[in-house]
Each structure stands twice: as C-alpha cells, then as structure tokens.
Regions:
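Metalloprotease/metallohydrolase-associated module, dominated by Zn2+-dependent proteases
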Residues: 1-39, 44, 49, 192, ...
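N-terminal low-structure segments adjacent to metalloprotease catalytic domains
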Residues: 1-140
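A residue-level signal for beta-strand positions that form part of recognition/binding surfaces
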Residues: 107-109, 161-163, 195, 244-245
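Solvent-exposed loop/turn segments at secondary-structure junctions
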Residues: 116-119, 169-173, 202-205, 227-228, ...
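Metzincin-family zinc-dependent endopeptidase catalytic domain
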Residues: 131, 135-216
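Active-site recognition of the HExxH zinc-binding catalytic motif
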Residues: 215-234
C-alpha cells in the first residue's frame, strides 16, 4: 500500500498539494475573519466612545435651561448701584469746545453738570458722562442731521441756553414729578432755566425695551430729552408694527402703543397692538453728505 500511495503521489502530485494548500488557506481565512471581526468590534467601540464624548462635550457647552421671568417694563432692570438722594446742587463736568451742526434756526449752547452726592465712578466718572453727551449730540444720526440745529458745549459762565444734569432719583422726582410711578427723565423749566434732567437710575440701569443695551439707551435718553428742548414737545406713537420707534416715543416705558396708552390715557398713543423696535436716533438712516 505504501508503494501504491507513493506511486499515486508521483503520478498525481498537484491534487494533494492543492488540497493541502486550500485547507491551509481556509484556516488562515477563518483566523483572519475572527481577527477582523474583533478589530471591527474594537473600532465600533472606539467610534461609539468618540460620538458619546462629542455629545457630552456639546451638552456641556449648552447653557443651563432656566425658567424665563416676565419682563416688567415699569421696573428698573437689574444692574449697578445708583444714588437715591443727592444734595440738589451741581458742579460742571467735561471739556468745553465740542460743536456740531449748521444752526440755521436754533443754536443750543449747553453745559454738562452732575449733582453733588452722585457717584459716577462706577460708570467711567464725570468726564465719561460729559463725553457721551458730546458724542451723541454730534452724531450724524442725531438732531444735527437737520440743518436747523447746532450744538455747542460751553462753560457755565458762557451764557448756556441749556443745562444737562445727571441727577439722583430723589431730585429727579422733585424736578420731573412722579405721577406715573416709574423712573423717568425729563426736560423742565421748573428752576427758570431750560434743563434736561437725566435720572441716574436710568443712566445706570437702562430700560427693558432696550434689552440690556445700555449704550443705545443712553443715546436715546439724551436725544429724546434734548428733542423736547428743541421744541418737540409732543410724544409720538409707533407708526406701524415692526417699525423703528420715533425718537419722541416714550421708549423708556414701552414700545407698544396700547401699553403706553394704559399708563396715561391722555397721551397721544392709540389703543392698538402696534409695537415698534427700539431706536435711539432722530434720523437713524441719514442721507449721505
């Protein structure tokens, strides 16, 4: 038999070799398959881990979900401290010399003052208050876009025609009244001099309709009250829902006609739901000069 097998192999050598090679290849393939499955499982685990980590990182970057409070436009927004009561006397601040506008009809010579007892250090100091007045009145979106008006920052002994005063809450109420029970500023002649009274609480805290943008609110406050001094005595309602609010609208209190009417039915506001967008400028889109 041994002789026959050797003869058979000698006569047909390829069959046994091929069979042996095929068997070896199958064993290698099975082993590689198991290894490949194992590698894929590890890859899947790694991929899942990376995806989970990324999702966790994404969640970590999201703000916490907190209940939203109702905005009460009649209240001061949260913010820094302000002065409840000052001394009802004033000192001059800022540098004179700022000027802007043509003044074809009206030249306003203004002085900037702060009430004794008001601490301006929390918002840049006395000069920062005066600089904001100067910059706002000189802005091309402001009143000087109309050639009828001109502003000049002068000293208190240089015959000013308008005093712009940063005033404590208590003094503001005496100067402006407190009939509607909300913090406001005003233009008044109660002292015999034309005066814009800037309520410090509003300068510090702003107003809810401006959604925390203190700079834009301060610009609005200046332009609105100076507008009264220029002769724009009447307030102006929101002309259409979604429009920019007129500068002479009482944006400190609300941007909605019906809500403003509810505060004072004798005012000009119609009883409609039109709500404007906050706007600090008389001419928000000035013509290119």
């Amino acid at each position: 038999m041994t002789v026959w097998m050797l003869v058979n192999i000698a006569q047909h050598p390829g069959e046994e070799v091929v069979a042996t090679a095929d068997k070896a290849e199958m064993q290698v393939a099975e082993r590689d398959g198991r290894d490949s499955e194992s590698d894929n499982a590890e890859a899947d685990d790694t991929s899942a881990g990376t995806s989970d980590d990324a999702a966790a990182d994404e969640r970590a970057r999201e703000p916490a979900e907190l209940p939203e409070g109702k905005v009460d436009t009649t209240e001061l927004p949260p913010g820094g401290p302000y002065t409840e009561a000052g001394e009802e006397t004033y000192y001059e601040v800022g540098s004179t010399g700022a000027e802007a506008g043509s003044g074809d009809e009206i030249v306003v010579r203004y002085v900037v003052e702060v009430e004794h007892g008001v601490d301006t250090s929390n918002y840049g100091g006395d000069d920062a208050f005066a600089a904001m007045i100067d910059a706002t009145l000189a802005d091309p979106r402001g009143w000087t876009n109309d050639p009828r008006f001109r502003f000049e920052h002068v000293s208190g002994d240089d015959n000013p025609t308008l005093k712009i005063r940063l005033t404590s809450v208590g003094t503001t109420r005496k100067m402006c009244g407190a009939d509607i029970g909300m913090e406001t500023s005003c233009r008044t002649r109660i002292t015999g001099e034309d005066t814009v009274v800037v309520n410090e609480s509003r300068w510090v805290r702003g107003a809810a309709p401006f959604e925390g943008d203190l700079g834009r609110y301060r610009q609005y406050l200046i332009n609105h009250e100076v507008g009264h001094a220029l002769g724009f005595s009447e307030h102006v309602p929101c002309p259409a829902d979604g429009d920019l609010a007129p500068i002479m609208m009482q944006q400190t209190l609300s941007l909605n006609n019906a809500e403003l009417r509810s505060f004072d039915p004798s005012e000009v506001y119609p009883d409609n739901p039109d709500t404007c967008r906050s706007n600090p400028w008389p001419y928000p889109r000035p013509a290119v000069q």
